[in-house]
């Protein structure tokens, strides 16, 4: 599919696609949607009055009629005739008395209940709505409920398999959990044995999902087979640490005997942070309490590799900021291919300041407080380097397994210790290792080649990205080592890396290892994504994922190592968003179709020139059935042009969309550098719920700074986060406000994390001109409060760029008085975007006497907001708050009518006797 282009007479070219069993799509959010109960039921109707608004004309949009108000100044019972005398008069008199009493009682009830601004929850509003007539869309069925979204009922099923190399380097082996007719709990199959319906032909690694160790029942939560498939490393009692890291108790299962023993027999209950198999299957390197240990399976003895790990020194595992911003994982330990060496990080946090996180209800340490301290919160001190503050000092160390010796290799790189960020380590052959590192501001990349045998190293490649295009180096761990093979035309070792090339990210092949210039494998006005995916060394083929057909799509391609014969292996004639994982030799792959239609998975054979399907392993029939039963939004993908930049947009229209109506519009955004929210994945998420059940239009635009639209559009935001991104949101909102079917007086914007920052920044810049409402969850409000590695990558240091930090901070409180109202929510135990951001903003609002906002805090919740039903509550609050915004509740609060005294109102309620 060709990329949309601009048109002389239109600012965008739409491509309309209603939801059906053959097509659906997805956006992703920094916050995510997960299993939590919510309030809404399936039978609720879309929240939309018959005329497409709230049921009020323009004059009454923000003012409901108070109960009884129309009759308040009229006599309850009046007559122009005089009362008769005698018995008739007495009867009339008592009748009047009764009527007066009844009128007074009714007036009193109306006084107690009438005229108040009723805060209306989304569920209450939905119950009160009449279903709108079907028009504009052929979709039929029930609306999507928030409960369905939060509990994952709309989430596709994906088959979990792991490719492994066989003991004799066989290709096409995979590890998966058994089920159905397949024998065993954990098993290894090759592609051919999977075709046997009786399950025979594979190898069972674990017969049961539980194991017994010295009479103790162990229920493993995860398993890692050894390379020779004779043993399995198990983890139990797993506890989360940060986003990626966790600890647990580790066990080693012998496949033949189905017996297990502790990883460290001398300390069976010790909590381990990381454990990795040796490539020879004869040892496990592991980390406990920030020190590295080696267990050789030939004995029960554990070798201590490092001894001084602790609160300020981390060995083999990342600290908070490296886990979050550099590695995006829990391991900084790497075995050499020949199992002779282990490389690992030594992280010194002595100079990094602590940030306290209070826990008022829970105790993450698991420790019982001392007597008398039960009512004090637990305080967790986190080593958290903020922008401009001291960074952790990270060194790469090596362990010689045979000599039982730890050493380091000094390389002159012109980076000071606190000005170096190591972003990737890749073992080559014969004890050589490639190390990619950047300066603190992530705009100079240096590649080192270290020889562990001679214990020497040197810089072999330098890229000054700041001078190239003013951009930055995004950390990644996708560099691929290519061993020499003269018989296949590769006389020297080499590697494949992603490099900037003519304004886009592309693949280059560097050979030999110390080559400063690579052979370009890809080129063009499009970008590769997390590439390469795999390399077929026998055929000299490089497989990769790219956004070539459109920024919103992902297809799989392959190219020769000399850059020739690039071809797609997925169908590029229609929109698609594919993912892939390859077998050890790249002869097979698990192909995952993520959308826009219902996702499916298949194992494919890539040995020949033609790709063949071996087995379709997942088709998600339950989603196909649900799509037929529910009224889903129509999604329209299009482009807008802002300041000459083409931006991707998706508009979600409610079922039965009627262009003659006026609809409220919610903008949803994330907008962080290199991110993407507008894509062709299948998803029924919170935005889908808003369109389907509440009847609002939802628009998402990926503005400047986001990913896969070229480096020029991406790098322009550097040093001034929020400046261009907010303008793109406002410019797009103005385009929508001018549409005939949009109610320009009811437009809102919301986002989480960076999206929360963008919500506030957009409201600040817009000053109520376009957006009347906003909802910000866990927002950054000052980039000096965020971590150093992320902030400085996109903003430089505060010392280097003080004006940029000042401009990016939410400071214009006067501008924030112009929207009708905005909402800010935050978890009090957010270790990522600290509560400090919202508290400092609140203080600024107080000092400026700003009142048009609401706050909601979630005790003990971190950045994902999950603690004690918080995840359900945060989305319920978003939904309810939005309903009240578009129903005019917040406008009534902002423009209150002066109230009457109780006595005046009581007198008005009395009947007038004539």
Curated annotation (Swiss-Prot):
Belongs to the peptidase S9B family. The chain crosses the membrane at residues 92-112. Glycans are attached at residues 348, 565, 639, 807. Residues 1-10 have a biased composition (Basic and acidic residues). Residues 113-914 are vacuolar. It comes from Aspergillus clavatus (strain ATCC 1007 / CBS 513.65 / DSM 816 / NCTC 3887 / NRRL 1 / QM 1276 / 107). It catalyses: Release of an N-terminal dipeptide, Xaa-Yaa-|-Zaa-, from a polypeptide, preferentially when Yaa is Pro, provided Zaa is neither Pro nor hydroxyproline. The gene is dapB. This is Probable dipeptidyl-aminopeptidase B.
């Amino acid at each position: 599919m060709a990329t949309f282009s601009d048109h002389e007479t239109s600012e965008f070219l739409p491509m309309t696609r209603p939801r059906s069993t053959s097509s659906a799509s997805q956006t992703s959010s920094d916050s995510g949607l997960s299993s939590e109960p919510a309030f809404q039921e399936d039978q609720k109707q879309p929240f939309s009055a018959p005329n497409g608004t709230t049921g009020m004309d323009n004059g009454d949009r923000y003012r409901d009629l108070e109960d009884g108000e129309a009759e308040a100044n009229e006599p309850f019972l009046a007559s122009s005739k005089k009362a008769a005398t005698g018995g008739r008069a007495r009867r009339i008199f008592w009748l009047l008395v009764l009527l007066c009493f009844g009128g007074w009682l009714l007036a009193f009830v109306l006084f107690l209940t009438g005229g108040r601004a009723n805060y209306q929850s989304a569920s209450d509003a939905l119950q009160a709505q009449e279903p709108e007539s079907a028009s504009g869309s052929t979709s039929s069925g029930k609306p999507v409920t928030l409960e369905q979204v939060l509990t994952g009922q709309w989430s596709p099923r994906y088959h979990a398999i792991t490719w492994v190399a066989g003991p004799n380097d066989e290709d096409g082996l995979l590890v998966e959990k058994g089920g159905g007719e397949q024998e065993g709990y954990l098993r290894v199959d090759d592609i051919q044995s999977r075709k046997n319906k009786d399950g025979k032909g594979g190898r069972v690694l674990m017969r049961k999902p539980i194991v017994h160790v010295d009479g103790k029942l162990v229920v493993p939560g995860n398993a890692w087979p050894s390379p020779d498939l004779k043993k399995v490393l198990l983890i139990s009692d797993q506890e989360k640490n940060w986003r990626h890291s966790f600890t647990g108790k580790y066990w080693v299962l012998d496949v033949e005997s189905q017996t297990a023993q502790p990883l460290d027999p001398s300390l069976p209950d010790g909590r381990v942070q990381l454990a990795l198999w040796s490539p020879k299957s004869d040892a496990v390197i592991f980390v406990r309490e920030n020190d590295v240990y080696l267990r050789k399976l030939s004995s029960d003895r554990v070798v201590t590799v490092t001894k001084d790990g602790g609160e300020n020194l981390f060995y083999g595992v990342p600290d908070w900021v490296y886990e979050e911003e550099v590695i995006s994982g829990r391991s900084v330990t790497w075995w050499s291919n020949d199992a002779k060496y282990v490389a690992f990080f030594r992280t010194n946090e002595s100079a990094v300041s602590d940030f306290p996180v209070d826990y008022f209800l829970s105790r993450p340490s698991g420790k019982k407080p001392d007597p008398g301290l039960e009512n004090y919160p637990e305080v967790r001190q986190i080593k958290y380097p903020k922008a401009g503050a001291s960074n952790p000092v990270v060194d790469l160390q090596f362990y010689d397994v045979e000599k039982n010796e730890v050493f380091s290799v000094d390389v002159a790189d012109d980076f000071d210790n606190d000005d170096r960020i190591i972003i990737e380590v890749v073992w080559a052959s014969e004890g050589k290792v490639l190390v990619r590192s950047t300066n603190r501001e992530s705009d100079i990349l240096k590649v080192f080649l270290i020889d562990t045998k001679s214990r020497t190293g040197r810089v072999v490649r330098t890229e000054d990205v700041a001078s190239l295009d003013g951009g930055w180096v995004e950390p990644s761990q996708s560099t691929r080592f290519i061993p020499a093979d003269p018989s296949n035309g590769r006389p020297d070792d080499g590697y494949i890396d992603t490099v900037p090339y003519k304004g886009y990210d592309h693949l280059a092949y560097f050979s030999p290892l110390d080559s400063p210039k690579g052979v370009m494998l890809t080129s063009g006005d499009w970008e590769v994504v997390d590439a390469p995916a795999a390399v077929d060394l026998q055929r000299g083929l490089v497989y990769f994922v790219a956004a070539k057909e459109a920024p919103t799509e992902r297809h799989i391609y392959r190219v020769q190592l000399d850059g020739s014969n690039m071809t797609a292996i997925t169908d590029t004639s229609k929109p698609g968003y594919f993912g892939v994982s390859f077998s050890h030799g790249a002869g097979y792959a698990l192909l995952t179709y993520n959308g826009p239609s219902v996702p499916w998975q298949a194992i494919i054979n890539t040995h020949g020139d033609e790709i063949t399907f071996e087995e379709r392993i997942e088709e998600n029939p339950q989603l196909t059935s649900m799509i037929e039963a529910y009224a889903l939004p129509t999604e329209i993908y299009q482009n807008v042009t802002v300041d000459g930049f083409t931006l991707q947009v998706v508009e979600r229209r409610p079922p039965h969309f009627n262009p003659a109506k006026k609809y409220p519009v919610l903008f949803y955004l994330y907008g962080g550098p290199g991110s993407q929210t507008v894509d062709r994945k299948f998803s029924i998420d919170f935005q889908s719920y808003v369109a389907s059940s509440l009847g609002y239009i939802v628009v998402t635009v990926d503005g400047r700074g986001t990913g896969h639209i070229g480096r020029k559009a991406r790098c322009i935001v550097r040093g001034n986060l929020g400046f261009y991104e907010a303008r793109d949101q406002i410019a797009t909102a103005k385009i929508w406000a001018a549409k005939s079917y949009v109610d320009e007086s009811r437009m809102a914007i919301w986002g989480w994390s960076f999206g929360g920052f963008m919500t506030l920044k957009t409201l600040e810049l817009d000053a109520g001109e376009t957006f009347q409402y906003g909802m910000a969850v866990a927002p950054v409000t000052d980039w000096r409060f965020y971590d150093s590695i992320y902030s400085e990558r996109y903003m430089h240091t505060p010392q280097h760029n003080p004006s940029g930090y000042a401009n990016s901070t939410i400071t214009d409180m006067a501008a924030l008085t112009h929207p009708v109202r905005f909402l800010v929510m935050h978890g009090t135990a957010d270790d990522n975007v600290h509560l400090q951001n919202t508290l400092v903003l609140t203080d600024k609002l107080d000092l400026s006497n700003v009142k048009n906002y609401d706050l909601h805090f979630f005790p003990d919740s971190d950045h994902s907001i999950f603690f004690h039903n918080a995840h359900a509550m945060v989305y319920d609050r978003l939904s309810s708050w939005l309903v009240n915004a578009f129903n005019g509740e917040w406008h009534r609060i902002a423009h209150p009518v002066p109230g009457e005294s109780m006595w005046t109102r009581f007198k008005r309620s009395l009947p007038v006797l004539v």
